């Protein structure tokens, strides 16, 4: 396969420029006490707002959507340009169409979609979660499974359509209802991996910059 070196160089330069501009010192010391009232901080373009630490769910009729640390922040579209807002809209719609509630959290301890999903299923009342990386890679996970095991994995993010994301939501809800749905059908393109491999790696590195060791997941209010 012919590699477009000019395009690859441009992608790398753009990402490095963005990363350089967003460098911040990281401190693990406890923040100084403040007398100012705390308010929820908007994330990204404002459709996601952190509203506090995510709590353990008690209702079995919920599925948690656990997103990566840069989702809706440094990255607002997936690897092929689908807006994160649209992706969440479809996943939530799919869950709700099955009569199940959706809860969205942001995970900070890892940028790996499997570990993001595991944090989600541990807090999910049903034990079912959907993990979504900022680049779009998605997994349906179940409490009790090892991180690298799953119910359904969607590794080829460039081939995931909005309709696919909706079907992922529907299947996750069916698992929450203890059903055994047929796996979501997906496209398969052997050239997708080599075509997007460099960009995928760069986007993963970019998301990893937002990992905060030891930080617990945050509940997100979603404005769609």
Curated annotation (Swiss-Prot):
GO terms for molecular function: cobalamin binding; propanediol dehydratase activity. The keyword Disulfide bond does not apply. Inhibited by glycerol. Its EC number is 4.2.1.28. One of its GO terms (biological process) is propanediol catabolic process. One of its GO terms (cellular component) is propanediol degradation polyhedral organelle. Disruption phenotype: Cells lacking this gene are defective in aerobic degradation of propanediol and display no propanediol dehydratase activity. A triple pduC-pduD-pduE deletion releases no acetaldehyde when grown on propanediol. It catalyses: propane-1,2-diol = propanal + H2O. Gene3D superfamilies: B12-dependent dehydatase associated subunit (3.40.50.10150). Belongs to the diol/glycerol dehydratase medium subunit family. The propanediol dehydratase enzyme is a heterotrimeric complex composed of a large (PduC), a medium (PduD) and a small (PduE) subunit. Part of the PduCDE complex that catalyzes the dehydration of 1,2-propanediol (1,2-PD) to propionaldehyde. Required for S.typhimurium growth on 1,2-PD as the sole carbon and energy source. This subunit is directly targeted to the bacterial microcompartment (BMC) dedicated to 1,2-PD degradation, and is also responsible for targeting the other 2 subunits (pduC and pduE). The 1,2-PD-specific bacterial microcompartment (BMC) concentrates low levels of 1,2-PD catabolic enzymes, concentrates volatile reaction intermediates thus enhancing pathway flux and keeps the level of toxic, mutagenic propionaldehyde low. Bacterial microcompartments (BMC) 100-200 nm in cross section are formed during aerobic growth on minimal 1,2-PD-B12 or anaerobic growth on 1,2-PD-tetrathionate medium, but not during aerobic growth on glucose, anerobic growth on glucose or pyruvate-tetrathionate. BMCs can constitute up to 10% of total cell protein. The first 18 residues targets this enzyme and foreign proteins (tested with GST and eGFP) to the BMC. The cargo is only detected by Western blot in broken shells, strongly suggesting this protein is normally found inside the BMC and not on its exterior. PduD and PduP compete for encapsulation in BMCs, suggesting PduD also binds to PduA and/or PduJ. This is Propanediol dehydratase medium subunit. It comes from Salmonella typhimurium (strain LT2 / SGSC1412 / ATCC 700720).
